Amino acid sequence: MGLKIIYGRAGTGKSTFCINQIKKKINNSPTNKLILIVPEQFTFQTENKVLNAIGERYVLNAEVLSFKRLAHNVFNECGGATRTIMGDAGKSMLIFKVLEDLGDNMTVFKNASRQKGFIDIASKTITEFKKYNVNNEVLDLTINEIEDENLKMKMEELKDVFNEFNSRLHEGYVDEEDQLLLLNEKLDGCSLYDGAEIWIDEFSSFTPNQLSVIGKLLKRAKSVNITLSIDEVNSPKGESDLFVATKNTEKRLMNLIQEEGIAFNGYINLNEDISYRFKENKELAHIERQLYAYPFKQYRGKNNSLRLYRANNNYDEIEFVAKDILRLVREKQYRFKDISVICRDVDNYEKVVSAIFAEYEIPYYIDKKIDIASNPLIVFINSAVDIISKNWTYESMFKYLKTGLIKEFRGIEGAELIDELENYVLAYGIKGKKWMEEWVNYSSSILKEEEISEEDKQRLERLNDIRENIVTPLDEFNKQCKGKKTLKEFATILYEFLDSKLDVMDTIDKYVDYFKENDMAIEAKEYYEVRDIFIDVLEQAVDVLGNEVMDLNEFMKVLNIGLSQYEMGLIPVALDQVNIGDITRIKSRGTKALYIIGVNDGVLPSASKEEGILSDNDREILLEKGISLASDTRTKIFEEQFLVYTAFTIAEEYLVVTYPLADFEGKSQRPSIIVHRLKKILPNVKEESEGFKLVDDKYEKISAKLPTLNELMIAIRKNYDGAEIEDYWKYVYDWYLREPKWKERIEYVRKGLEYTNLENNISKEKAKKLYEDNKNKISLSVSRLERYAQCPFAYYIQYGLKAKDRKIYEFTAPDLGSFMHEILDEFTNEIKEKDLKWSDLSKENCRNIINSLVDNQVKNNKSSILNSSKRYSYFTDRFKRILTKSVMVISEQMKRSDFEIYKNELAFGFSKDVNSIKLDLPSGESFYLNGRIDRVDKLNLDGETYLRIIDYKTGSKKFDLNKFYNGLQMQLLVYLDALINNSENIVENQAMPGAILYFRIDDPILKSKGDLTEEEIKSEVLKELKLEGLLLDDVKVVKAMDNTLEPGTHSLIIPANMKKAGDLGKNKALITMEQFELLRKYVNEKMVEICQNMIEGKIDIEPCKENKNIVCDYCNYSHICQFDSSLEDNRYKVIPKKKDEDIWKSINEKVGGEVNGD
């Protein structure tokens, strides 16, 4: 009976010493038990190491245990296993309920207890109390002595939570910390380990409970040997001493044996021998000794074992690591299992490491736990509850359906059904009660109901069948979950819903079988483990809180809190693979080569300073009062220092330290102080970078097949551009050509070099087939011609190939335009029927008629989007205000005008009144233009008839002569030309152009420095909604448009002003009759030019660019054309900024005439 301490710095062979002693004992045929105790996370690795060192005899004669396994053995042998051990899930769920029940009586934690994450913090504090033997009695004594009021209140509330938790827990359970307390009790009367020889390895400190267990073992065992990582024993220590934590542990152990009267069998100093791990490596031995030595010594010998690499970013960093690993394996005969990669936060590096290592064909295992929240089963459960608690939203429904756990929707066919369903749901705004109703709408308009075809009826019938299959079990689940129930009842309902109603558990079994058959071990493990975790959490919840009454949302909170405590460990899929992990989890286990990545300031060592519920100051006060708890943040800084020291002493032969200059988000980063320290203690080490590498490897770019192919592509590109490349690339190229798997890819590379996204013209025959209607005519609108002028390729995709966007149930700008136009047209018809004149309309008339028209429109179309929600009801009221304001302005404009409204919604190409505009092309084909004019006004003056076209717009628009010249704004001139050409049929005599104007439909917000009178408001509104466009430069005609226009004034309703002399002021909106004629000629020639290009199959990727306005910014097809202005062949069609007089001159030159823009 006695304690022996085996000590030495990192790499001195402490673990190997223990294993060798066990091996020696086994060789001598021991009669007593041989036990090696290590931390829980190292049991598997240690078992492997012992098995490799000793062989099968180890299994019969020795055991590798953790304290947890030790307790399990004692309870099984000597009793104590009567109460179930509660896992972290049950513990967290119980704490949640305790906090809920105590919440209103709390002061300090009342608000915090409802915050996400507080349960974990509270759980850690309870665990800490138990680890450090803080019980109710200790808390009472300490609280009475605390003078700090805030800490006193905090401790009183913590005591209440602690006591309530223990009271409920001990009704039938113990937690893991109680295990050690129970183990202490049981060891007193248990002879299981009497006479055993015990080694305790890999611990830097022990909790009070663990120390108590060690004390009990010391009394019963033949010997207890404990390893400690220390430079020297019985030496003075300061808090900055690298080994302060282990020296404190040594002190506690010595105090323990003195108090218990146990013999001390002395020290074994492994520092006296040559470092076991670094005996063949001077540089690594020097790092171990001098990394934290003050003052330090320098090593000026040759450096072969340490590399420092400064990476541009994380991708460059990991690619360097991958290439170097392959170099070690190929040239130095390393095995992948001899290599480890470690960092401070493996989560940050997981994705980039996985991607690059896969590319370089490096087998690897990431030693980390993964969150189960994204597993399909957990998503399925949460989204099922979200569906019924959040009113059947689109997001929750399709999360639920896309998990793949409903058997009807598995596989490709199931996915296609979901896609079809999703398209309908998005197009028709299905949510809430609409899921419970039969779907009958299949109209293309979101504002009006339409007749549907037989084909669409069949689609609807199929969709309704799918809907029924989805809704029926969910609706039943919803009804069962109404109101408050016990947690046990909710658990039963949920499990029956999953297992009996939907066969989800059976579906998971099928997935597991499929994954196993296809060598997908990780996926198979995830699916069956998460299912078992869910069942376990459900059972724990029932055991702990089964009789608690709650509603569905509270039940899901409890369940998710339990599930959140579980993380799933990944399993190694091969024996020979690179080990990747956090520095806190990876220990030296035959690691010949080590890569420490992400060695940046604030990252390694970590700068994290989370205090938890108890601050550093609180802990100091409690320590003064006799309560010793876990480390404060200051102590953790020095513990982090020891962690770094441990990490840098893992490698046996080769160490690589890397850091990126920028993080994953592109933010700059500095190297860690460790990098500077390494440069000081090893002055001969040279820092490498992408442009400077010490390892002379002219074949560095030849690595794994895929990255080598990428490098080959770059080399081929250089050669294609005339640059010199290394000779070996032709042999690499030949190798890929000989390999069937890669030959096709090489061909793609070659084609890629010749690739251009420029499109060849399609044939005239193909263009006709694409653009002709079912009557073999090419009929189109002016807006489509303008679209072609913007970009021929976009037109080809939209109107030739008939590409369509996914239909979404939303009110878009075109929908708004259609709605406003329709109401204005109905308004005009209404006042005609009532024999009212525009000029006689009052504000009340306007409001009443508009309200009635809008209400009828919405009422008569039940499926209209304006009936779908309160939000759209608000929009409807807003539309009423806008339309009312607009018709009032139109009324005022008509009062001030001698022009009269002749017709609304005048169609050409759709009626007998106005024929389509026929465009005869030079090549012999004909195009037919159809359109609809919002409003035509007429004026009879001095025996002549003048026509004025008004185009309603929901946004601001002015006539731009430059856009017109380039075919981007032709519509009003085309309409005018059609009217003038057909005027004898329309107005029964030849008419002349009076104006083409835009009217903005709006209820403008007025800006003013002070209050305005009613008259001033009226004037400001008229100014804001002034008609914009071109007017005939004739004072009589202009005066007829605004009969209030007087000499020396500006019109409030049209873009014109009158000089004091009575003639019109200079204004680019005023053009002569000859100029109107010129524009009409030009627009016809421009349309013919556009149509000729269209029929000839020109589909150039040539988007227009005017100043900063680029057509591509609003194009839905940019991902198809892949236009890139940086490519040599990709060019914008630039619309240069020109003066109006220069444009008039160009128009003159194109169509003839002597009219200028002056």
Swiss-Prot record:
Binding site for ATP: G8, R9, A10, G11, T12, G13, K14, S15
Co-factor remark: Binds 1 [4Fe-4S] cluster.
Biological process annotations from GO: double-strand break repair via homologous recombination
MF-aspect GO terms: 4 iron, 4 sulfur cluster binding; 5'-3' exonuclease activity; ATP binding; double-stranded DNA binding; helicase activity; metal ion binding
Catalytic activity, EC: 3.1.-.-
Swiss-Prot/TrEMBL cofactor(s): Mg(2+); [4Fe-4S] cluster
Annotated SUPFAM superfamilies: P-loop containing nucleoside triphosphate hydrolases (SSF52540), Restriction endonuclease-like (SSF52980)
Keywords: 4Fe-4S, ATP-binding, DNA damage, DNA repair, DNA-binding, Exonuclease, Helicase, Hydrolase, Iron, Iron-sulfur, Metal-binding, Nuclease, Nucleotide-binding
HAMAP family: AddB_type1 (MF_01452)
Record note on quaternary structure: Heterodimer of AddA and AddB.
Note: Despite having conserved helicase domains, this subunit does not have helicase activity.
Cross-referenced PANTHER family: RECBCD ENZYME SUBUNIT RECC
Family as reported in the entry's similarity comment: Belongs to the helicase family. AddB/RexB type 1 subfamily.
NCBIfam families membership: addB_Gpos
UniProt protein name: ATP-dependent helicase/deoxyribonuclease subunit B
UniProt source species: Clostridium perfringens (strain ATCC 13124 / DSM 756 / JCM 1290 / NCIMB 6125 / NCTC 8237 / Type A)
Gene name for this UniProt entry: addB
